[in-house]
Amino acid sequence: MLNKCFIKNYNYNIQLVRYIESKHSNTFQIIKDYMDTLVYSVKSKFDDYDIALLTMLFETKRMSQNTKVKRVYLYNSYSFIHQNYITALLKEAFKGVIEIVEKDTLNLTYEGLQKKNVDIIISNVKLEIKDIPVVQISDMPTDKELSKIKKLL
């Protein structure tokens, strides 16, 4: 009689293979074809679960390389404390996706923004800056405003 743990793991493995094969079909097929040719050399059989794990490994690397950190300039008309709070709020909301360009190291000119490779400006006041997206937020950013920022990222 098969134990329940074995059956549970077996079912999980089948679901995992199906998901990975569907989500990353090109990579899965390339690895499967390569492993089929490798079978002759190593005299070992690789099942779909092994191929799914290798696919996950390659896709994880590919996805992590495609993530580009966006440089954000935060312009705020309030105090230093308010600026720090909004900075922390944005960093928490967009972990690993944004880098805040420090305000004291930059003049708010197009040339200054360009020098620092600013991708997006977030401000609680209306700004007219050419060629760099500006998202105007309220003094305390709402979920709708955070969603708008997320779309730009």
UniProtKB/Swiss-Prot annotation:
The keyword Endoplasmic reticulum appears for this protein: no
Domain of life of the native organism: Bacteria
Disulfide bonds: none
Alphabetized Gene3D superfamilies for the sequence: 3.40.50.2300
Keyword Transcription: yes
Keywords: Plasmid, Transcription, Transcription regulation
Family membership noted in the UniProt record: Belongs to the AtxA/AcpA family.
Protein name, as recorded: Putative trans-acting regulator pXO2-62/BXB0076/GBAA_pXO2_0076
Species in which this protein is naturally found: Bacillus anthracis
